[in-house]
């Protein structure tokens, strides 16, 4: 049965109320509160029963047949919401807005919250170590404005990027956005890509909210930024019923203030998760995160993904690490204090979104309790933090909240004795009930002579006098007792005196619960006023925690303070890959990386498995760690400020977009060529492997030549195309290095040491032997290799096909080739067009057509 088919005139009052609410939330699954359950009806019930594996039943609703229904318990609803939201559904929570005890007729109900992928604010449904962002995306002629919000903490940021779809997708993936809001659905290809390929929730909303948040919006000068915030706030406030009153700060993210890395580099370098298993374990953040608070972990991740370019700010972090390393006693005290701090950021968020309970207030109190200690230690260390200790708030919470409160805020037992006089009086009445029962039982026994009677209580019948069957005859009319319950072996009565006391005690219990809830709400409102200050405190605590974490790492992993220079040199002595070093079962072999005196490119050759990729990643990781403010894994390091990092490491297809290894290579190479400057770092690992040998070799050489001639970025370029090693003769900024290995018969030993010069063997068969390929296969491979090498030696050099240009060719031919290559518009040439040009050049070389070019 579908809603559209229902005759609404026949619906029961309750179902009519449901339909009225559902009409306003047609795209959401409505969780409709009925007593102790959230119920779903009609299509929502069909979807929920399928997705949550619930039993589908029916409910009488005034129609000829029952309407589909399923439900979940209200006190265990979170796992069900999480499952639905992760599957891409939005859930609207419909609560009872009146107390059924005091309501005649239908209880008023309404939607109190709408939950989607980007608006989950409940800590139980969030990863402590990750932010949860939703974003508005507005397109303008020249730029795209992203407005980003973490609803769980109130962190609001805005950034503008070039109007380029690929760059937009990169930002969406880098910030790990859960949900994005577009003003229209005209860009269907982009919307489909985000939804179907990357699993991002996409919402269309064309409205803006101006007046309600006018004070905040009036602080913004840029009209486009103002539009972005008003667009996001309309969706969150009006459509999702979120309280945004605590947001009073806008973070303006300027991309040129940070070292730029695209999502490919972040993944290739395994900064946040490993490439193969997509897990945090064995990533760089896994290694560096020694934080004691969830806030600190999130801050450290932000630093890692946004390394600084301001030398003074970087050195400020170095100074703090150095100070902590020299004050180990203070550092230990600081670590112990930080360990006592809960997630103040998200606790403040819970105050605003209404999900706060008494246990949260207790966590907040305990966090505030150690702030004076943290402030004192920070001051002794010379840290420039103006930490607010929130003394008044601490005193309030300490006097009000019991040490072990319940999770529910509607069951009482939250507020301390002595906090409220009226509450204390009610509790005296309630506790006096126990004494009354004992005294009353003794008195009745004496008055009636019924020695085996008992006075008891249960929730159904209240207080009663229980008389065994053998003593029923002793109950006299003059007692004026009223029979309440007949059991097999006894009768239960209520007397006028007991009834009066019962009313007083039970009323006290109800009044206690109501008053405690009222007091809790008053306390919550006081805390709400302090949320902006709490957020500032949380930001400073997370800074301190992240710095302490980096200090711990510097000692645990033997890291050193790098020297930052304005010169265009990289000088790393005994550099190490920190993660590989920690997880390696054998002793790690450190390596130098020297790029100075006009040398900005290392052309790396060597066997597979010898450590070329690790060496390349190692340099990038040292640069990133240095610019995030961390000490680095080496004996010494002198580094410039790098503005961008581009990487192509590892051969893989882009399965989600259906692109081949070669196409992915070409796109990433083009990004580097188009975006790199002389202050950038480029890492290309075996570029060109994804296509035919000669095509790949020609492209690899052409790309390397272009970078060396036109960009002069710091470049590490590994290859198995040994012909490329001749390039150092014509390009003085290229230096050949290789990863050494020792060959002994059929055995090979990788030394993992970078040495000057090149090698002309890849030892592929030796590596296959290490992989335990069958001997028969290996022997045949060796025969084929010997045959190729023999034939190659017999050939006249003029007959060999050499894609690496022979540097002894006549000057005219060389000039023509240069002229042809220089005429290519690299930034606007597609990979296919580039291949066609190279193919044409090759054909003309073969046919001797150069005279008429």
Q: Model-predicted segments: where are they?
A:
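Amphipathic heptad-repeat alpha-helical coiled-coil/stalk segments that mediate oligomerization
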Residues: 207-212, 260, 275, 366-435, ...
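Charged catalytic and DNA/RNA-contacting regions of genome-maintenance
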Residues: 1-323, 336-339, 343-352, 356-442, ...
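Charged, surface-exposed helical/loop "interaction arms" that form contiguous linear patches used
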Residues: 343, 353, 357, 367-370, ...
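Terminal-proximal interaction/regulatory segments of ATP-powered molecular machines
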Residues: 458, 825-853
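Extended, charged helical/alpha-beta scaffold domains that provide interaction surfaces
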Residues: 14, 30, 446-449, 453-469
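Active-site phosphate-binding and catalytic loops of NTP-dependent enzymes
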Residues: 94, 117-126, 243, 379-382, ...
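ATPase nucleotide-binding head domains, primarily ABC-like/P-loop NTPase cores
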Residues: 42-45, 222, 292, 297-298, ...
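Extended, charged coiled-coil "arm/hinge" scaffolds of SMC/Rad50-like chromosome-maintenance ATPases
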Residues: 487-525
